[in-house]
């Protein structure tokens, strides 16, 4: 069937194509529709062996079950003849040429769906999910981009929510993960071999009683208008992107900055940006333009860029109306200003005229070989250069997290978290409308940037999925990438004949892209910062084994629950030698298991000594410590009461505070000594940031987690990345 350039293959044609790549189907025979069809169908059934299935097949027939075009469990010749006759009678003129498919009756209590779909942004994907007639209702699926490796195919099986169905099930053997992986790789090879394929459906894939798998239905759709991938064009685009990386140095480490459109009014962008630039300690040369030559915050302005010295300014921060910005780009080029950040609105976000104006701006920037950021953005921060070129606060402490965002608000949010936690930022930039330079290009720079240890990104719309995926893949090879994505929507109209297409969505496909490329995707800004801060301040775990050390029993329980339910980390049973060593330091009432609950039996040195025993043990890969700050919390209450500093309170307050400070310091020191992550969590990290224990964690350069669950989740995600890149076992 050919509709609007799309060719839908019949089931028989689809199976014939896929068999070439190793897809295993049930034994079957195709019987053409003619005067002898019924007799031929009966003979085919007898040769295959009863019981059999008989289906009506045609190029225009997709959902056979819904139309009643399948007869199951046929166990004798007479029944086969009746079924063949009834099915042929159901054929309509819209079905085109039809035939009968006579196949061995396969059975299995578990059904899967596998296939190929083409996403308009990211290209071809392999799909695996729970199959059968409730496929769309259950919608438990995973996607992975083509090409798919054997390793990737095995990993897909663990991404389904109901993956326990792959194990032993109601007297049946566990599924052959090897056979299932081979099926997925075969689908990938078929799609790679023929770029015109737009979708493949295999539904169901039956899991037999012995765990082997067999495909019993197939549907292939091709798009004759698709000539193949534009590899040459994509290569040229990547080369162009890579050539811009050197220009980012002029943006994030400029020798000089000019604020174009400076203002004397404290409510205007031209004032705020100049104020932030000066106040945050930028040491390069600062210039400003002002039509009336006003002196703004001690900076004597000039009338235009043409009045500035040449080859001394690397970046222009533009706060002028959109109508003036083409001329400003030309003036910047004359003065060899190579990077320009435009805050002005009135472009792509402002209707048809704005879209046209943005296109003119893009064309001019490319013509002049200027790195253009924005328009309609809030600015950038580069703490290694003490640079705060933005129209809003805050300015974060120095650190190793670098932020890129399609939303300026998220840039501010992440920097606010940095100020609150004292886990600092290296670079941060709002992409604005991303006319010429968006998140992919910024990621390419972060990948090569020595100041960046981890990239933290917020994404909404995706302009070029393949470019974004390539940038993600590039950076995760050398450093972690944490992503929050908003704006999950339907992936648009896909072929109604395809179950695979119906199950796809932007969000599921994006999950597949992230998983395949080692990207750490999270749901919220809070979790994103937790994870990025963990990457930036802790060693990567070398394995899954974690121990929870707690002086607060309840928090140990709920943290352990998160670890167990997440099924990423392993809450190990304490080795006998470790348990015995801990018993020598604690009263007999301690928990004697993991979590290690000290049960109130601590002396002055107990926590540091127990923490050390756990951290240095070869069976332990990471440690979470709960209960910091409790002593200092009591100390605070003592200082606020009417009896302080009498009755020995001054001495005990000092002791309590020193103990919490010591615990935090020991955690940091042991982490460095053992090269293992040791995470410290307490609600006081939010409830009382001036608690000496919390402050000591911050002074050590590490994150004080708001609770054990958040620490456990962050640790699990860092372990997954470490495992993906081959660091962890």
Task: Tell where the protein language model's regions lie, with residue ranges.
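Catalytic-core regions of core metabolic enzymes
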Residues: 1-729
């Amino acid at each position: 069937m050919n509709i609007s350039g799309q060719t839908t293959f019949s089931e028989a044609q689809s199976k014939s194509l896929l068999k070439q790549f190793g897809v295993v189907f049930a034994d079957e025979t195709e019987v053409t529709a003619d005067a002898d069809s019924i007799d031929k169908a009966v003979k085919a059934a007898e040769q295959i062996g009863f019981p059999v299935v008989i289906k009506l097949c045609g190029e225009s027939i997709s959902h056979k079950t819904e139309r009643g075009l399948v007869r199951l469990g046929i166990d004798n010749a007479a029944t086969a003849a009746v079924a063949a006759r009834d099915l042929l009678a159901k054929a309509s003129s819209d079905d085109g040429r039809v035939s009968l498919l006579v196949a061995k009756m396969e059975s299995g209590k578990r059904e899967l769906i596998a296939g190929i779909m083409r996403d308009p942004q990211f290209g071809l994907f392999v799909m695996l999910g729970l199959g059968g007639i409730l496929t769309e209702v259950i919608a438990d699926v995973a996607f992975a981009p083509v090409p798919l490796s054997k390793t990737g195919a095995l990993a897909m099986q663990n991404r389904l929510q109901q993956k326990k169905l792959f194990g032993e099930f109601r007297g049946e053997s566990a599924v052959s993960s090897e056979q299932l992986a081979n099926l997925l790789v075969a689908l990938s090879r078929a799609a790679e071999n023929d770029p015109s394929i737009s979708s493949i459906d295999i539904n169901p894939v039956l899991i037999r009683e012995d765990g082997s798998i067999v495909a019993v239905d197939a549907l292939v759709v091709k798009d004759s208008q698709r000539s193949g991938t534009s590899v040459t064009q994509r290569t040229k685009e990547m080369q162009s992107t890579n050539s811009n990386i050197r220009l980012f140095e002029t943006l994030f480490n400029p020798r000089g900055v000019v604020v174009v459109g400076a203002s004397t009014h404290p409510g205007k962008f031209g004032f705020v940006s100049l104020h932030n630039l000066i106040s945050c300690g930028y040491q390069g040369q600062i210039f400003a333009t002002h039509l009336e030559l006003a002196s703004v915050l001690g900076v004597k302005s000039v009338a235009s860029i043409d009045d500035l010295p040449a080859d001394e300014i690397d970046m222009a921060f533009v706060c002028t109306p959109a109508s003036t910005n083409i001329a400003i780009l030309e003036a910047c080029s004359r003065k060899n200003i190579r990077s320009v950040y435009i805050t002005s609105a009135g472009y792509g976000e402002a209707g048809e005229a704005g879209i046209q104006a943005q296109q003119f701006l893009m064309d001019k920037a490319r013509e002049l070989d200027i790195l253009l950021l924005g328009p309609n953005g809030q600015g950038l921060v580069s703490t290694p250069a003490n640079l705060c070129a933005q129209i809003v606060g805050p300015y974060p402490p120095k650190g190793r997290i670098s932020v890129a965002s399609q939303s300026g608000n998220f840039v501010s949010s992440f920097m606010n978290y940095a100020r609150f936690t004292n886990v600092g930022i290296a670079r941060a930039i709002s992409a604005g409308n991303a006319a010429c330079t968006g998140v992919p290009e910024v990621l390419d720079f972060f990948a090569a940037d020595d100041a960046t240890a981890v990239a933290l990104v917020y994404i909404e719309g995706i302009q070029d999925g393949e470019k974004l995926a390539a940038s993600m893949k590039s950076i995760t090879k050398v450093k972690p990438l944490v992503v929050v994505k908003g704006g999950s929507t339907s992936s648009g109209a896909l072929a109604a004949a395809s179950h695979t297409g119906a199950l796809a969505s932007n969000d599921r496909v994006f999950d597949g892209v992230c998983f395949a490329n080692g990207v750490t995707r999270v749901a919220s800004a809070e979790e994103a910062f937790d994870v990025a801060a963990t990457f930036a301040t802790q060693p990567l775990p070398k394995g899954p084994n974690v121990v929870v050390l707690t002086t607060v029993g309840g928090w140990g329980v709920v943290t352990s629950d998160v670890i167990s339910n997440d099924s990423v980390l392993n809450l190990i049973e304490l080795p006998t030698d470790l348990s015995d060593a801990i018993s020598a330091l604690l009263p007999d009432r301690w928990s004697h298991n993991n979590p290690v609950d000290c049960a109130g039996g601590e002396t002055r040195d107990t926590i540091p000594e127990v923490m050390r025993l756990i951290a240095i043990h070869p069976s332990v890969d990471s440690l979470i410590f709960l209960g910091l700050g409790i002593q200092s919390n009591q100390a605070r209450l003592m200082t606020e009461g009417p009896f302080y500093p009498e009755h020995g309170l001054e001495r005990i307050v000092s002791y309590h505070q020193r103990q919490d400070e010591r615990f935090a310091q020991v955690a940091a020191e042991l982490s460095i000594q053992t090269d293992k992550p040791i995470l410290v969590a307490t609600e006081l990290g939010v409830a009382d940031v001036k608690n000496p224990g919390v402050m000591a964690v911050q002074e050590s350069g590490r994150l004080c987690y708001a609770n054990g669950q958040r620490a456990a989740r962050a640790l699990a995600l860092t372990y997954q990345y470490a495992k993906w890149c081959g660091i962890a076992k």
